[in-house]
């Protein structure tokens, strides 16, 4: 998602939803709220503070060295970017279109390079051309194995779907759907899947 813009999230379906969020770089910064959010919070007795914490003013006082967030001015509000829907579309990779970008890796495992050009120290063309500070890769497979993956920068695995096996040296770990695994650096990693339908393992690494 582009920065310097306001965004909101809503579950538009009938089932419980999950958004897996990756923030670029090491400092996510401070959230800037639209004025209406802060105004409504104050009306209900809640207060958002300058460290992004939320307190109930009916039960607590503002801690020392903390300040109440005040609504930004109209002048500051005008400095944020606005995008048309067609302009945002280039930042979206639709699930149904991912099959057009699959790369065969080895033994039944395919790679879909969503963001960034690197996966396990090899370069690939990304679907979304956006400098985010991280790489987002997806491993796809029903039954397959890929060995000797090495990551020299902070990397996590997140199982979008399926029960994946991750082997590091002699140790084997089961990564079930919705599980997250932070990998050790500069260590050979093997990943395998054994299922009757396609499964997906997200890999996020620092660029």
What are these regions (language model features)?
Residues 8, 21, 136-140, 156, ...:
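Conserved hydrophobic/aromatic beta-strand scaffold that supports enzyme active sites
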Residues 24, 138-141, 149-166:
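Short, conserved beta-strand element in jelly-roll/cupin
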Residues 48-140:
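A short, N-terminal "cap"/entry segment at the start of jelly-roll beta-barrel domains
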Residues 135, 145-147, 153, 169, ...:
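Short, solvent-exposed loop/turn positions at domain surfaces
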């Amino acid at each position: 998602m582009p920065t310097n813009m306001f965004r909101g999230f809503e579950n538009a379906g009938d089932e419980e939803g999950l958004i897996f969020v990756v923030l670029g770089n090491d400092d996510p910064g401070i959230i800037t709220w639209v004025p209406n959010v802060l105004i409504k919070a104050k009306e209900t007795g809640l207060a958002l503070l300058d460290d992004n914490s939320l307190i109930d003013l009916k039960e607590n006082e503002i801690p020392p060295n903390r300040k109440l967030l005040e609504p930004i001015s109209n002048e500051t509000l005008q400095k944020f970017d606005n995008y048309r829907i067609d302009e945002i579309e280039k930042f979206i990779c639709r699930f149904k279109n991912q099959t057009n970008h699959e790369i065969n890796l080895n033994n039944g495992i395919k790679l879909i390079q969503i963001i960034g050009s690197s996966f396990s120290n090899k370069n690939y063309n990304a679907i979304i051309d956006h400098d985010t500070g991280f790489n987002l890769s997806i491993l796809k497979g029903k039954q397959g194995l890929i060995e000797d993956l090495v990551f020299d920068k902070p990397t996590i695995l997140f199982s979008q779907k399926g029960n994946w096996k991750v082997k590091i040296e002699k140790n084997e770990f089961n990564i079930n759907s919705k599980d997250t695994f932070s990998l050790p650096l500069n260590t050979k990693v093997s990943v395998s899947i054994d299922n009757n339908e396609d499964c997906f393992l997200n890999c996020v690494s620092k660029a």
